[in-house]
Amino acid sequence: MTLVEILVVVVVIAVLATMVISIAGRIDNQGKERSVKALLAQLDAAIQEYRDFTSAFPAQPEKNFANAPAHSELLYRELDAIPSSHSVLTKIDDSFIENKYGTADTPSEIYDPWGTALDYIYAAGDNYPALISAGADKVFDSADDITNK
């Protein structure tokens, strides 16, 4: 083999490796998107149970994505306090529920598969609460956000 042939083989292998890595990353993100959509559906069910029991949605009027962990913690606490919505919460995979920001006696937050706390927004006058995942870029209010609406 000549040096040129070896270089051609190395280039072909590098191109193939790049394609495989790119496809694997895309498949991973698609799986995470499906997971977060399923999570939002479970949380929607828990919110409906909460509403059926209390005749109201958990309030959280602040739209400030910097406070998403606090909003998520508030939602978890409210849903956990009602038996019917609590039973829905127990069906959520434990990998989405963590207590990263509080002490052991504070409620957990709800996280998406990328490790970002979900945001929850509901103000008086809204038709339905918004659950928002920041998506793969982990930045709220960007094109890849995933919501329950």
Model segments located where?
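N-terminal single-pass transmembrane signal-anchor helix
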Residues: 1-27, 32
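Generic detector of short alpha-helix boundary/capping microenvironments
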Residues: 15, 43, 102-104
